[in-house]
C-alpha cells in the first residue's frame, strides 16, 4: 500500500499547482510524473490483473502458439523476447508506449494537466495488468485529436492500428460522431429508456442465452463474473459517481458547441447508459471491458469541473470525494476473498 499512498499523495499535492501560471515548474513536474508512471508500471512484479498468464506467455511466445492473444500483442512480445528474457524490460517498453501516447494528449487538451494526472492514476489503477487493452486504450486516447480536428481518416486508421492489440477498441468507433451537443430532453430521454431496460431486466430475458457465444473463453468469463458479483455496492456507487460528475459538468456545456469538454461529456454519458443497461446482467463483465474506452474520459470531466468551479474549498471537497470513491474502486474492486492482485505492490528487485 505504501507505493499507492505515496503516488496518490504526491499527485494530489502536484494537482494544486496552477499549471498555466507556473508553466516552467509545471513542465518539470509533468515530465517527472511521466517517468514515475513508467517506472510504476514497468518495475512491478506479480502485481496487477492476469499477471501469471501474461508472464508465462512472454517466456514462451517464441515457440508456443497462443491463439487467444491478438497478433499485434504477440508480435510485440516476440520482438522484446527475442532480445531478452527479462519480463520487466517488456513492461518498461509497454509503459513508455502507453504513457507516451496518453501524456501528450493530456498536456495538449486538459484545462489542468496535473490535476488530470491525479485523476488518471486513481482511474487506471484497476486496469493495471490489462496489458493488451491498455495499449489499445492509449491509442484511443491519442486519437481524440483527430475527432476534434475532424480528421476522420486518421481517426479510423488509429482504430485499425489498435485492433491487433485488443479488438474491443472497435466499440470506440462511434466516438467520432459524439462531438456535438444534444438538447437536454434527449439526454434525459436516453437515460430514462436505459433505466427502464435495466429495471425490467430486458437484456437477460431476451439476450442472455447468447452470452456463451460472445464471451469466448468461458473459464476466464466465470472468473471475472465472480469478481463482478462481489461488487453490487460498487456498481451502485459507480452509477452514482458517473451521474454526479455529469450533473456538475452539464452547466459548463452552455457555451460549448464542440471541443474536449463536450466530447468527454458525451463519451462519459454513453458509458453511463451502457453501464445502466448491462449492470447486473450476464453481459456485465463483457461490456465493462468495452466501456473502459468511454469511462476514462472521467479524468477530463473532473478536471473541467474542478477548474470551472473556482475556490479552494470546492476543490478540496471535490478531490476528497473523488479520491475516496476511486480508492474504494481501485483497491477493492478485484478482491476475491483474501486475494487482491494489487496488494502488496511488489518491485522486481
How would you label these PLM feature ranges?
Residues 191-192, 310-329:
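Signature aromatic-anchored transmembrane alpha helix within multi-pass, membrane-resident enzymes
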Residues 47, 52-56, 67-70, 74, ...:
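Alpha-helical transmembrane segments and terminal signal-anchor/GPI-anchor hydrophobic tails
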Residues 155-158, 168-179, 190:
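Transmembrane-embedded, aromatic-rich helix segments that form part
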Residues 2-16, 36, 93-97, 131-139, ...:
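Membrane-embedded alpha-helical segments of multi-pass membrane proteins
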Residues 24-25, 31, 103-121:
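Transmembrane-helix signature of polytopic, membrane-embedded enzymes
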Residues 113-130, 134-141, 168:
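Membrane-embedded helix bundles of polyisoprenyl
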Residues 140-153:
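Membrane-interface transmembrane helices that cradle and orient dolichyl/undecaprenyl
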Residues 17-19, 23-95, 328-349:
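TM-lumen/periplasm interface segments of multi-pass membrane proteins
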